[in-house]
Amino acid sequence: LGDVYKRQDKDHVSGVTGLLDRLDVDTLLLPEGEDDAGPQEAVLSAAGAHGAAVRFITAEERLDFGRGTLTVYPPVGDAGDNERGLSVLASAGENDLLITGDMDAATEKKLLETFDLPDIEALVAGHHGSKYATSQALLDAVRPETACISVGSNSYGHPTEETLLRLARQGCGIYRTDLHGTIHLSWNQEESHG
């Protein structure tokens, strides 16, 4: 199993090391560059201890998995670990899921300017539903039908009302891990969206 580690931040390191403990990870994909928060060494050490190869992403890469593909986009932001993470487009047939990580609206704009993103069926809302992510420009460009928000109890107010309203105005079905628990998405292979 390959794993994509979208960005190197303290609040994400334990998740990666936990996955390495539980899953047989062949290759770990990481954003190239130094990390501001300092966890890169811990991730590299954990990958080595579990026998996982590490590949740094510097250009768009497409990985085929049977009837599905992952398109991994390199960092497009300039400052801060949130802006220098990987983005991932998971595709199966005519269905697409986009994960932008914790990037803000300015970096989402750069992502849209740099890569040709399709209309998507599902979006993992950026930065746990922060008001600074999941911009209207991104929603207008990729037109998601479903939004998933990975969030737990926090002191930041995530997800924010602004983000929830943007998603509702877009017509998205909204699913939140804090309210709904683990979210499973599946598509009927016979079904076609477009």
What are these regions (language model features)?
Residues D3-G194:
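Non-globular, low-confidence helical/coil segments that flank catalytic cores
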